[in-house]
Each structure stands twice: as C-alpha cells, then as structure tokens.
Amino acid sequence: MIKKLRNQIGLITLSLALLLPAHGFSQDGNPITPRAAVAKQALREVGLWGIGAQVEGQEPLPSDLWQDADGESIGLAFRKITPDQKFMPLQTLLQRVLFSGGTAPVADEFTSLERFKLAARIGPINSSVALLAQLPDNITDTYTALAIADTLLMANRIDEACAIINGLQTTNAGATLGKMRAVCYALNNEFSAAQLAIDTVPQTGQVDPVLQWMAKAIANLSAGAPVSNIVFRGEDGMQIAISRKLGLYPNREALDRTYGAALSAITGDISLARAAVMLRASSMSLITAQQYSEFAKDVVHVEVTTPVVSSSQAMPPVNGALVEPLSESKPPVVGRNIYDLLYNARSFNDWVGLSGRVKSQLRQVEGLNSAENGFLANSAIINGDTASALHFLGQTDPLPWQDLARSLMEGGENNLAIQRRLEAAASPKNTRPIAVSEALLAWSAGLRGRGLSELLNTNLPIGTMPPAGTMALLDMALARGSKAEVGLLAYLALQGMDPKTADVASVSRIVSALSHVGLEKEARELALYVIIARNIELAPPPRQIPSREQRPSTSTTRPPANTALPLARPQVPSNNNAPRPSASAPQSQTKKP
C-alpha cells in the first residue's frame, strides 16, 4: 500500500499545485496541454490508468494497451527503466506507452503511481508536467509529490515546486526531501537556511557527489564567488535549477549524463551549448524533427559549388613557350555541405537526428558520386522518405542490406527482399552469418520470404545478451497479448545496449514480440533501425588529444567549466577535388557544416 502524507496542510498545498487551472507548466509560461483529459466521474471509473497526455508528433496507443498486463511485471519495469536507451524506436514507444491512457490492468494504486513517476523522468518535459497535473486531489504518496516537484523545477516553475516541498512534513523521503528544501532556500536567496538544510541531509556513509556539488554551489551563491570551478549538472530538476541560478550550461561530459525530461527541459535555455542540446534531444525523440529543423533553419542551407579539375593530359609547347594545361569543368555540386553534415555526425543517433533535420532539403542534393548517393539514401530510408530513397538508390548500386532496409521502410510483405539478401555475393562485409542475421530481423518484423532453413545451417554471431529474466517476462507478456507490457519489457531488455553489438537473435525475439501484439509498425521501425545501425559507416573520429593525465602539465590554470560544444567534427577546408568514398565503405575528408 502506498504511504500517506502525515500533514494535511501538505495535502492541501499539493492539491492546489496539481489542480492549477489550464496553465500547463511550459518553460515559457504559455499554456500547453489542457489540464484534464478525463472528467472526474470518468476518472473514478477507469482509475489513474485512464489519464493520458499528448506527446507532440506522436499518436497515442489504443485504449486497450494495458489490457492483460501483469501488475507485478509492469511495476518492476516502471522501477527499473532508466532514460539510458540507444534504440530510439524503443524510446519513442516508451513515451507512447507512458502517456497513453486506457483501461486499467489488474494492479494496485502504488503500481499506477509508478507510471507517473517514470513519465516524470522520461519526458518530454511538457508532456510530463501535463500528465502529472491531471492527478486527482486524493493522491497522498510522498514520492509522487517529490516527483511532481522535481518536474516543476525542471520546467522552471519554481513557486509551484517549492510550495509542494514546503508543505511536506515527513521523514520518510530520506535525503531527497532535504536536498529539495536546500534548493528551494537557495533559489529564494536564503543561503544560510540552504546551507543548514544541506548539513542536515541524512548521510548513508558513502560520498554523495551530488550533495557535495550542491554544497559547493550554494556556498558560491552565498559568497557571490565566481563559478568557473563549478560545472553544470542536469540529471534532475534540482540540479538544473541550481545550474540555471549559477548561469551554467553543459559541456560535453555533462550533456552525456543528461537524459529524458531533464534534457528536454533545457532545450529552451539560451546558451552556447544550445545547438548541441537540440541535436541530442532530437536524436533521443525528445523534440520532433520538425522542431529541430525549425531551430536550425538559419544554420543549414544548400550550398552550390562548381568543382574545376585540371586535365591530366600533357600539353605540348607552342613555339617554345609553355602553355597552361586545359581545365575541364564539371557540373555543379548542389548540397555537398548537407552530405558532409551527415557523414561527420559524431554518433549513429546524432546521424539519425541530423537526417531528420535536413529531410526537406535532402532531395535538392545533386552531383555527388555513386557511393555518396548511396550514403544519402540511408538518411532518406531512416526518415521514411520513399521518394528520396528511390531517387538516391537509383543513382548507385544498392548494397545488399539497403534493399532489405528499403522494403522494411515501405511496409507490406515483400517476398523477394529477403531472398535477394540471402543470395547476395559474399564479401568480408557480407558474410553468411551477417546476411542471415539481417534476414532474421526482417522475418521477425513481418517480411515474408523463403530461406528460413538457413537459420538451422548458420551459426549466428553472438552479441551482448539482454537479461534472461527480462526476456522470460517478455515471452509471458507476449502470451497474454499485452501491448504495454511487451513495450515496457522490450525497452528494459535493450536498455543501455548498443544496436551495433546487441545479440541479433535476442533483438529479433523482441521485434517479433512487438509485431505479434499488434505493434507491427513499431516492430518494422526497430528492425530497420538495427540493420542500418550495424551497417552505416560515418567519418572516423578525429585524433584524440592526450588528456591532462597523459601529458606533462605546463600550467596550473584550470580550463573554464563552460565551453561551447561543437555540433559536428572539426572543420577542414573543403577540397572538391579529393577522392570521395567507395561504394562499399564511404570515406571522406572530415568537414564541419
């Protein structure tokens, strides 16, 4: 059973904060989603599971999504899921599961509240606060109140957040409540009270780096000292609020630790790091491709260049005088900067985000060679842009896996794509195990084709295995036909894994489970994502500069804590005469947009 708040004044404060009329909690103060999507009477009939909120650019799942779910299984998933997900189709699916209301499963109120607390961490931030704002006024769980307050801190709604914190009179929340009180005092410039609250936070005997960071930050705020020796932290609302108070913004290391609702909350913060923040948010499905494109509309434009290549043919002298060699003009290249932007992406997920950003401009690119057109076809496929995919594939010799990926993108049942994949000529990059692995992903996603016997004749490569217990729960959820439970366990099974190294047979089981509970589109997207992730080749990373520990120190001066984050790799002068990548392995000079 859930724990009750001890002080009824706290209940009144919490209720008032949750029932604020129609204002959402957007960072700019503008209204967002209407507060109540479910009327009070209807809410009593369907319970907390009927509450939902809109995620921009996404369709909610059907109202039967929670049907036949096991309460213990989904409760475990709610508690164990983190925002650390590299399979972005599963990130999108998790958002749709958490923010879709439907018929209640057989589960207690505690489990239903776990859904709201997870939604508060996963984001996007506007959807999180809109969902939490619809909780009824009889919810008295301390940890739910803390989740609401932390989400409001992320959304920069300081007064509402601190009203909830100040109203709680409980000792059951441990260190979290003490830290939140310290943050609220600091945000209100009551630094002595903030330092006292930090000193009284319960200790566990282990060093708490967040508590140490907060103590240092509050001391600096109190003294008005420079903040050059304090770095941005943004893993939760408390850290974001203090970082904003100090005027900090994330460096690369801090941004790599920022996920979910916390990351989406800082997309509107103006700083030198905003371009990198927006790219990361786009690659993690926290903003739409359209939102990212609108942000970057003045950054990316289609360049036109006219390469001139000197003739290699020797020219004879005329009357003893040397003659300059003839130059041969080539057709203009349109949009090489678009190609370079994509090819120099720092990671596969960044490449996905950048592909969405340039979707409307991709079709304008012309004049590239065969291998480069094949590379751009991948962006069109991951965007679901059939016309552009066919255009670029028509200007190259498609690689065996690209034909399979295109068929997954188009949907339907392609009886030849799998067969062509299995019959493709062998090469070091197209061994039999690789071909059968990709065919297995396509089979699992619903593509039909001959060749299943190859699974008996081929030893598939073994990659990183998901937890066996999670996979067993997934099989049980599949047998019950629970959409939401299968979606949650699919996310949990691949949490923290790399699409390039995850065990392909296990991923195929997950793809098949999604398909068989009615999530066919999501299954295809996941299979497509994995096939491209395992094949695409981006520019090699730049040479790493030795770290401070690896080289002699010449100065005791520390670098500034806040430095602007580059959007792509370092720029080198463009050389349109340089050889371009081959069809089998794109290689290019490193460029920055």
Where are these regions (language model features)?
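Extended amphipathic alpha-helical segments with heptad-repeat/coiled-coil character used for oligomerization
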Residues: 160-252
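Bacterial N-terminal signal peptides
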Residues: 11-21
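Residue-level signature for tetratricopeptide repeat
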Residues: 118, 147-152, 184-185, 379, ...
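Long, internal scaffold/assembly segments composed of regular secondary structure
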Residues: 214-390
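Compositionally biased, proline/threonine/alanine/serine-rich low-complexity intrinsically disordered stretches
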Residues: 25-51, 539-593
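Generic helix N-cap/helix-start motif at coil->alpha-helix transitions
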Residues: 73, 105-113, 137-146, 171-180, ...
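Structural motif corresponding to the intra-repeat A-B loop/turn of tetratricopeptide repeats
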Residues: 122, 155-156, 188, 383, ...
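Solenoid-like repeat scaffolds
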Residues: 59-68, 82-83, 98-105, 132-140, ...
